Amino acid sequence: MFRFRLDGSSGVPPYLQLVHQVRQALLLGYLREGDRLPTVKDVAADLVINPNTVVKAYRQLEHEGIAGGRPGQGTFITATSSPALPEAQQALRASLEEWLRAADEAGLDDEAVTALIAVARQELRQELKKERVQ
């Protein structure tokens, strides 16, 4: 069963962290249409958070068309990711795993890896903007 994790130091509200994790799990194929999400009660107890936080996340997922509640049964994934995405992501994941091994060998911790990716992504976006303008 799918399990959530929270990062208290991320600065991202807990309900958004839950929403982002479901989106990512769906894109990566860890969750599929019809899969049941953990109950509000279970998530709240597991993460030691207010159940209303979980309800807010699940409502956001419902609003986005990603999940839907079934009375008396729970909340289920209702959306599917693009069929081509998992295949495309397999190649990207293989490249990423190779890169992460190199980062690990270089002694980078999770925070340094995240920062490096964020900076590289930002620089690439700026570069792409410049190319579009020219």
Label the predicted regions.
Residues 15, 39, 73-90:
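Short, cationic-aromatic polyanion-contact patches
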Residues 24, 60, 119:
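Alpha-helical DNA-recognition elements
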Residues 30-35, 62-72, 76-79:
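Beta-hairpin "wing" of winged helix-turn-helix
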Residues 36-47:
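A short alpha-helical element within helix-turn-helix/winged-helix DNA-binding domains
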Residues 52:
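Key DNA-contact positions within bacterial/archaeal DNA-binding proteins
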Residues 81-106:
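Conserved segment of winged-helix/HTH DNA-binding domains
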Residues 104-134:
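C-terminal regulatory/oligomerization modules of transcriptional regulators
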